[in-house]
Amino acid sequence: TMADSKEKLFSDFSPVSTEQWMEKVTADLKGADFEKKLVWKTNEGFKVKPFYRMEDLEGLKTTDALPGEFPYLRGTKKDNNEWLVRQEIKVECPKEANAKALDILNKGVDSLSFHVKAKELNAEYIETLLKDICAECVELNFSTCQGHVVELAELLVAYFQKKDYDLTKLQGSINYDYFNKILAKGKEKGDMVATAKALLEATASLPKYRVLNVNALTLNNAGSYIFQELGYALAWGNEYMNQLVDAGLPAAMVAKKIKFNFGISSNYFLEIAKFRAARMLWANIVASYSPECLRDCENKGKDNECRCAAKMKIHAETSSFNLTLFDAHVNLLRTQTEAMSAALAGVDSMTVTPFDKTYDAPNEFSER
């Protein structure tokens, strides 16, 4: 039957050379300039041709990359390309925030982000906020005033221990981002190394909690080009590695505590390329520190190098830079394509911002 037939139909067509393609394209342009009409000149400083041939791939080492294998160009997971759907909650009242969290969890969200007030932090506050939320079933992310991140970490660990959770299984993050504060405010505050050390010590029992943040979303929302966001983010992450390894902390431990928050612009194909390049470049940056593998792991590199430490943890959020005020429902289309590019690129979690974020407090419809 035809269904069982495995004929190679391409053999019925004679091969077409690049020169023949160009002749056909030039003829169809009817005298228009090929470079001006069809070649895309990106803001990143390189040109994208309208078609590519096998010869364009010659010499590229990345074409043999596989998912889940160093340097993780095609993702850090071998078997799937799943991502977590995250929603942000600004906590004004812990009881109300808890009710909202439970509601959106029932609607399919599997990652929560709480922005909590530092002045109100105590054990009762955490218990009220997380009541009936299974910390082993959902990723929990927290941010607060940078001077109170260690206190927040200690309260969370105490709460998880009180609830008798297996802390080695819990996934989440605490947003300590020393360099973002400098970027936003133009001045240093506190001792990064001392705070980071205290934070790593406080979360030692939470190996899957990332607590050193690279918030490149700030750059994206300020209108940076993709290459700028990528370059600064990698330098930012490397600065954590450099200072903390110099302070005596193991490279593998530091790398496994860093999380990257990127924005997603509407530049569809280059956003896919950005996330893929970010993973590959970060893997090589971490590898340059020769992180030592401290357990029996099949993902070891040469000389007992910890390849797991080189996996970049990425959260992505649709950009607010290009949201429009005057026809806000257009933002639904923009955020949809932005989210799709991040999903195809293999991010770990994603926030799609409400379409009316620029002018109104989000309601149930816009959050959905």
Language-model regions, residue ranges each:
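Catalytic alpha/beta active-site cores
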Residues: 3-267, 271, 292, 297-300, ...
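Helix-loop-helix hairpins and the membrane-proximal interhelical loops
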Residues: 278-279, 296
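ATP-dependent phospho-/nucleotidyl transfer catalytic cores
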Residues: 280-285
